[in-house]
Amino acid sequence: MLSWAITFLIIAIIAAVLGFGGIAGTATGIAKILFVVFLVMFIASFFFGRRGRG
């Protein structure tokens, strides 16, 4: 249980550094781009995966 507490402490420290450091705007832009890329990859794999099972 102590390992989980240490893990969440490290995650909270990293989030605080990124949030208070001014990187939040850049990270938001990168996250939007990655979301669109992975959404397109998911849709493509869904359609191409269905064709192979028929």
Curated annotation (Swiss-Prot):
Keywords: Cell membrane, Membrane, Transmembrane, Transmembrane helix. The chain crosses the membrane at residues 4-24, 29-49. The keyword Transmembrane applies. Its main location: membrane. It is found in: Cell membrane. Belongs to the UPF0391 family. This is UPF0391 membrane protein Pfl01_0044. It comes from Pseudomonas fluorescens (strain Pf0-1).
